[in-house]
Amino acid sequence: AIENLQKTNPKYKQDCYVLVDMGGASSEFIFCTKEGIFAKSFEIGIVKAKDKYKSIENLLKCKDEVLVPIQKFIEENQKQGRKAKFLVANSGTPTMVCAFKMGLKQYDSKKVFGETLHRVDFRDELERFLALSYKERENLVGVFRADVVPFGIVLFLLFMEILDFQECLILDEGVREGAAILGILDKQI
């Protein structure tokens, strides 16, 4: 997906970018360069943040606990010359925030693919989401996600902050898609 975007948009024709894949129990930070992929998993995800910190306020009070290990990984990569030029987000929270912003009644991965979100978009959509009644939240994202969505949005904002990016590129392709593509490419070589 990135290779195709690099062909059509010079903004993404860079030697290094970082992909953040935020899950329920962990989040992966992946520095992608021409020399290879440098990744690390951190034991903080959306559900884990909700279970551990119980409130957004507590998560924000304890943000250093979350961010210091990530900051060390970022600094290690920068010392090795891996300074990301743009941020890619492919997990459920950023794609969902993009769909909210676009006013999609039904999620469509093709519509969010390649869109750009700014920090202010995450803040605005968090505010809009929190203004809904709990029942409206459940109707929008489902019973099992209604209470974790705010944690996901705040956590991703913290990740953007520590990475020092104001915007991120939204892609809706994950590990399975990447593995499938690599498998196809390996067979073609």
Question: What residue spans do the PLM features occupy?
Answer:
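Acidic, divalent-metal-coordinating active-site segment for phosphoryl/phosphodiester hydrolysis
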Residues: 25-28
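Helical "lid/coupling" subdomains associated with nucleotide-phosphate turnover
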Residues: 2-16, 31-189
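Conserved catalytic-loop position in the HRD/HxD motif
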Residues: 21
